[in-house]
């Protein structure tokens, strides 16, 4: 029984409860310096990901609103570009850019 309790405690400690991502967390990255790995280490996996080759966008849902982190492809890999709220205007911009670059329909999850 003690072994079972110890195993559960270890799992809770190592797996832990993830902290809630805040807008402040998303705004704390350095432009053209922070990498995708930096972002994933700090705030975890995004709710959605859009990969168009030249750019990648991660979406995080915070308090019922979506915020996106934009990455641009550089010779050194993808680098953080900016954080913004996902508005209809920005979603339409992403749709147009994605469809032009990939010649594929905009993913339903992003519409």
Question: Which residues are covered by each model-predicted region?
Answer:
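Positively charged n-region of N-terminal signal peptides that target proteins for export
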Residues: 1-4
